[in-house]
Amino acid sequence: MKKPIIEFKNVSKVFEDNNTVVLKDINFELEEGKFYTLLGSSGSGKSTILNIIAGLLDATDGDIFLDGVRINDIPTNKRDVHTVFQSYALFPHMNVFENVAFPLRLRKVDKKEIQERVTEVLKMVQLEGFERRSIRKLSGGQRQRVAIARAIINQPRVVLLDEPLSALDLKLRTDMQYELRELQQRLGITFVFVTHDQEEALAMSDWIFVMNDGEIVQSGTPVDIYDEPINHFVATFIGESNILPGKMIEDYLVEFNGKRFEAVDGGMRPNESVEVVIRPEDLRITLPEEGKLQVKVDTQLFRGVHYEIIAYDELGNEWMIHSTRKAIVGEEIGLHFEPEDIHIMRLNETEEEFDARIEEYVEVEEQEAGLINAIEEERDEENNL
């Protein structure tokens, strides 16, 4: 990894008035020029991290670094970051141009440069021609663009975004996701985005930190987070999941629902109790006799791009299926899935334990592969004599 632009070392936060612990020993590094998302439900601590970076809150313990410099005692206005708030925090008595130009005027930039830079950023956020428009006459999406333009006008090292899309309607929110991501990539500025919306995080991020109860429970790329959740919380918080109790018989073989299935996971103890995760979109409806499992359809909803089907197996386990094929309530169907569709989670495994287990397992696999290759080469040499 390159030199981090932001680093948290053992950062904790306790609100002393009610002794509430909101952050617990947070450690992470953010690389320059990437789009990071802090994802979690209300009260998870994600906005607290953002406010500590901005200097709006002090950490109780730990160190915060910006570009290698400890900034715990540096005031907000001296930090090379800018925050876009959920409320946008625009000045209603100023027009669009004046709002965007405000940070430059605070720094006493000359009028010609202000004109050039404001014109440039308004073009970036697709607000050309809105310079003299009153803030009160703008739509929610337009106000959002003004707030972003003001955030980037000083070319900060980091832009912090605290749930800026939450007040927008679905269509506009989706459009702004594309615009934010494209803008970040064009500028090359580090974006730190806070949201409770899983789809936003998956769509825009280079890297996601999933938070719960003041802790980072998992971090990774959107694909890693979605395909390889490390625990029950992440599996249920990120998308829909079918989660069942199971037993890892041995590497690549798991038992659940009273049957054994091939899998792609390994590195666990023989007969270890685990949780089995299969995503609804990975289940394919078949004839009952052709399925690996048989279930009875209970309810069905049309979601536009697919049907969401709820079914139950003979053991009473609930199954959610996303299918373009319409089912009939009350009918018995088969469910087919591939070994790679089965994800295995150890009970109560932390991210550190997960990473260590995978690293150790890969090393053992490589050693075994090397030994097999050596034996085969030795046999080939003997056969050639």
Swiss-Prot record:
EC number: 7.6.2.11
Sequence ranges assigned to domain ABC transporter in this UniProt record: 6-238
Coiled-coil intervals: none
Subcellular location: Cell membrane
Any one cellular-component term (Gene Ontology): ATP-binding cassette (ABC) transporter complex
Family, per entry: Belongs to the ABC transporter superfamily. Spermidine/putrescine importer (TC 3.A.1.11.1) family.
Entry protein name: Spermidine/putrescine import ATP-binding protein PotA
